[in-house]
Swiss-Prot record:
Top enzyme category: lyase
NCBIfam families recorded: leuD (TIGR00171), PRK01641.1 (NF002458)
Pathway: Amino-acid biosynthesis; L-leucine biosynthesis; L-leucine from 3-methyl-2-oxobutanoate: step 2/4
Known EC number: 4.2.1.33
This protein's UniProt keywords: Amino-acid biosynthesis, Branched-chain amino acid biosynthesis, Leucine biosynthesis, Lyase
A GO biological process held by the record: L-leucine biosynthetic process
GO cellular component terms attached to this protein's record: 3-isopropylmalate dehydratase complex
InterPro entries for the chain: 3-IsopropMal_deHydase_ssu (IPR004431), Aconitase/3IPM_dehydase_swvl (IPR015928), AconitaseA/IPMdHydase_ssu_swvl (IPR000573), IPMI_Swivel (IPR033940), LeuD (IPR050075)
Protein name (Swiss-Prot/TrEMBL): 3-isopropylmalate dehydratase small subunit
Amino acid sequence: MEQFISHTGVGVPLRRSNVDTDQIIPAVYLKRVTRTGFEDGLFARWREDPDFVLNQDTYKNGSILVAGPDFGTGSSREHAAWALMDYGFRVVISARFADIFRGNAGKNGLVAAQMTEEDIELIWKLLDEQPGRTMTVDLEERTVTVGDAVFGFDIDDHTRWRLMEGLDDIALTLRNEDAITQYEKSRSPFMPRTI
C-alpha cells in the first residue's frame, strides 16, 4: 500500500446523502477475482445520466470526493473502496461514514476524512465557485485546504498511522516477522506452520 501524507487534487462535489455500497458499485460488477478493474462500475447507475458529476469534463480527473452524510452504508463491499481507488480517488470526505466502509477504506489506502456537514457545505460552495478547483488533504495535520480556507477533519489515530506508514494488513503482520519466525521454531515439527 502506498504511503499517504498529503494529496492535492481536483475536488468532486457529490451532493448525495445515504450513498450505499450498491450505489458505489452495483453487485453485477463484483464478479472479478482480482482487486483491480472496478472503475467502470463506480456509480454505474448514476453515470448513465449525462449530467452526473463524474460525466462532466471538469471532474474527470477528480481525486477527492466530497460527499453528503452517511457514505458507504449497506453491505460490506471491499469492492467499494477498490472502485473508488481504481477510478482515481485518494480521499472521500463525508460527515458520516458507515463503520465497515471506513475500515475497508483505510485498509486499502483510501482516506475517509470525516468533517462537519457545515464545513462540507462550505467546501461545496467553494467548488461551485471554481469548478475543477484543487484541494489539499494533509493527513499529518488532519486538514483540508481549499484556496485560503482550511478545515479540520477526523480520522482515528490507528488508521491515520497505517495510511501514513503505507501499511496494509499483510505489511502490518510482517512487521512482526521475527517474532512469528521464533514462534514457528518453538513449535513441534509435526504441527502445521502458520507462515
